[in-house]
């Protein structure tokens, strides 16, 4: 973990948790160094995961961009995901999704369903033993009641794999 931090990877929460929340579109506060997911998006995601049956300690976070806002290199993103070892990777925005697409391009290209391989918003893909879900703009959806319902429907596709909390 320390070597990832030395490489500029920002992460938080409990390592080896079943859910990894990745984001690449940071708030101004997060870009200035605030804890990722410390705003309304983090509160809403945590409440949603709890409602699905995840225990409060069952998620961790990963920022898909470096301090300058550039996407993490594919090998670094892949190393971070492998180190954190989630069962489910939830990409909260298109930036994070693109970094994941780049990091897992070979595995995604091997999927039988081309649509699934593109990681479109709302579709769950199974890659390297993990469930990948692209929420497609979670933070932006919080201001629109209809879009919040869409996000909730998407999150319901990835319930806990074990007994609910």
Whereabouts are the PLM-identified features?
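A polyanion-binding, active-site-adjacent surface
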Residues: 1-165
């Amino acid at each position: 973990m320390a070597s990832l931090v030395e490489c500029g990877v920002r992460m938080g929460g409990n390592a080896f948790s079943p859910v990894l929340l990745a984001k690449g579109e940071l708030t101004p506060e997060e870009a200035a160094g605030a804890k990722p997911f410390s705003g309304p998006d983090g509160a809403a995601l945590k409440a949603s995961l709890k409602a699905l049956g995840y225990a409060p300690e069952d998620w961790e976070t990963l920022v898909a961009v470096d301090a300058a806002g550039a996407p993490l290199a594919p090998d670094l993103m892949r190393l971070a995901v492998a180190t954190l070892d989630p069962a489910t990777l939830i990409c909260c925005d298109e930036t994070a999704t693109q970094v994941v697409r780049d990091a897992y391009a070979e595995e995604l290209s091997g999927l039988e369903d081309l649509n699934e391989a593109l990681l479109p918003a709302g579709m769950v893909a199974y890659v390297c033993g993990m469930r990948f879900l692209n929420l497609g703009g979670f933070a932006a959806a919080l201001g629109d009641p209809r879009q919040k319902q869409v996000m909730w429907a998407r999150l319901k596709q990835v319930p806990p794999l074990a007994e609910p909390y």
